[in-house]
From Swiss-Prot:
Designated name of the protein: Chorismate synthase
GO CC annotation terms, alphabetical: cytosol
Pathway: Metabolic intermediate biosynthesis; chorismate biosynthesis; chorismate from D-erythrose 4-phosphate and phosphoenolpyruvate: step 7/7
Source organism of this protein record: Staphylococcus saprophyticus subsp. saprophyticus (strain ATCC 15305 / DSM 20229 / NCIMB 8711 / NCTC 7292 / S-41)
Gene expressing this chain: aroC
Pfam family name, one: Chorismate_synt
Length: 388
């Protein structure tokens, strides 16, 4: 299973082609659009999300509600393109066109791809870099993840994501999984505790007022993953490694951990390793889940717990110093419309990116042409955990 995305932030559309989805999988557009809607939400989002009404259109690979086994093509229209047709259109324009020249960017923003991307691809207008490097592309990746989640749900694999920290305000209380499930969508910061949610909102408001931005930590929990997905044999087949790469490939993500993550460095091994237990109903299981569902690069049957660290968004309304690439003079960096905090929305992005990585690994592990084959093989693997 693989995918390709194309499109610019203010271009006419984002396009996704997904290859390798088994045939006979029931696809409901409303389920995909629900994920798209969640990505647009969250406290701290900017004005762009008031313009876009993200909804996907399926143009290939699905007929009468079921996948065909051929490549699936999805389109997400950029409503804001209406205001950018001349600037972002494919047709040549005159250098004397003043409307376009006003949008030329020569002052790169610290923390963005602007300067290095301009150097690498020899662009003198840095808009050619920022349009593709924009986090707008994550809308396409969420669409891919939504299809992946539909597939995984047919295998009784379910996802939950939440915010655990924004701008130093932490929701680090211990919750059972049922409490997390029932509370994550009850407020606009996607945090379990409502009192902590308000403190986070206040933190976001203060950053916005100061022309600044803040980051945070998000968590994705996956329930129902069968044992042995991934491999200890080869470095590039370790499932936790593949998930880690997927997470840090998301715009502004600078770190990833599993289970207790970096806290493991503070504790002795006796408090971090998860004891192995057995009963005739569940088979092998662990007495705890400090390692977040992984051993040796493979799923061990416990819930997979992925933590991702998002840096503050680098576009600031009180910009930092930069240098004009034409004059080499010092200036304040360019300002683009942006969010003051996108951590709640990013939790949705991480969830869907992880869903793709897991679906891809499963389809490599269990070769199949249609969903019924896959379901049969997953059932056998689950029995292995009891019978071994």
């Amino acid at each position: 299973m693989r995918y390709l995305t194309s499109g610019e932030s203010h271009g006419p559309q984002l396009t996704v082609i997904i290859e390798g989805v088994p045939a006979n999988l029931e696809i409901n557009v409303a389920d995909i659009n629900e994920e798209m809607f969640k990505r647009q939400g969250g406290y701290g989002r900017g004005r762009r999300m008031q313009i876009e009404k993200d909804a996907i259109e399926i143009v290939s690979g699905v007929r009468n509600g079921y996948t065909l086994g051929s490549p699936i093509t999805l389109i997400v229209t950029n409503d804001d393109f209406t205001h950018w047709k001349k600037i972002m259109g494919a047709d040549p324009i005159s250098e004397e066109d003043q409307d376009n020249m006003k949008r030329v960017i020569t002052k790169p923003r610290p923390g963005h791809a602007d300067l290095i991307g301009g150097m690498k691809y020899n662009h003198r207008d840095l808009r050619n870099v920022l349009e593709r490097s924009s986090a707008r592309e994550t809308a396409a990746r969420v669409a891919v993840g939504a299809v992946s989640k539909i597939l995984l749900k047919q295998l009784d694999i379910n996802f939950y994501s939440r915010v655990v920290e924004i701008g130093g305000v932490k929701d680090d209380l211990e919750y059972d999984l049922d409490t997390i499930k029932s509370n994550i969508d009850k407020n606009d910061v996607r945090v379990v505790n409502d009192e902590i949610a308000q403190t986070m909102r206040d933190k976001i408001d203060a950053a916005k007022k100061a022309g600044d931005t803040i980051g945070g930590v998000v968590q994705t929990i996956i329930e129902g993953v069968p044992v042995g997905i991934g491999s200890y044999v080869h470095y590039d087949r370790k499932l936790d490694g593949r998930i880690a790469q997927g997470v840090v490939s998301i715009n502004a993500f600078k770190g990833v951990s599993f289970g207790e993550g970096f806290k493991a460095a503070e504790k002795p091994g006796s408090e971090i390793q998860d004891e192995i237990l057995y009963d005739t109903t569940n088979g092998y299981y662990r007495g705890s889940n400090h390692l977040g569902g992984f051993e040796g690069g493979m799923s061990n049957g416990m819930p997979i717990v992925v933590n991702g660290v998002m840096k503050p968004i680098p576009t600031l309304y009180k910009p930092l110093n930069s240098v004009d690439i034409n004059t080499k003079e010092s200036f304040k960096a360019s300002i683009e419309r942006s969010d003051s905090c996108a951590v709640p929305a990013a939790s949705v992005v991480v969830e869907n990116v992880v869903a793709f990585e897991l679906a891809k690994a499963l389809l490599e592990e269990f070769q199949c042409n249609h969903i019924e084959q896959l379901q049969s093989q997953i059932k056998e693997r689950r029995l292995l955990n009891i019978e071994y």
